[in-house]
């Protein structure tokens, strides 16, 4: 592994997610749905995301989460990307994220062969996906060491 055995856990996570999103976008293989520019990411959100590359960032964040905890499915992903639903004068409650977005991200990552279905339920990283993530983590570590 480049970077002397650096893994995803060893680098700054925000920089890693940004680098992985750039890698996914540059590869051009991630299938992005047509509706990405008009969708909200959860029912508790008031507006659609401002960033045009949000699908790549969500995919990178999802892959990172699968690296840290394998066997995670769509149900777990919608809880991770959930948040506080503001109900005006009524008390706030937790609201889950969009199930369709979580499912489409996982399906797109499966098409890239980074993620596969786990026989015990959920999804897990493939060996190729783990290799790619460790390689990108090594690049992030080397870049942060230079600056």
From Swiss-Prot:
Listed PROSITE patterns: RIBOSOMAL_S19E
UniProt xrefs under InterPro entries: Ribosomal_eS19, Ribosomal_eS19_CS, WH-like_DNA-bd_sf, WH_DNA-bd_sf
Cellular component terms (Gene Ontology): cytosolic small ribosomal subunit; nucleus
Cellular localization per UniProt: Cytoplasm; Nucleus
Subunit structure: Component of the small ribosomal subunit.
Family per record: Belongs to the eukaryotic ribosomal protein eS19 family.
The protein's name in its UniProt record: Small ribosomal subunit protein eS19
Organism (species): Ictalurus punctatus
Lineage: Eukaryota, Metazoa, Chordata, Craniata, Vertebrata
Chain's gene name: rps19
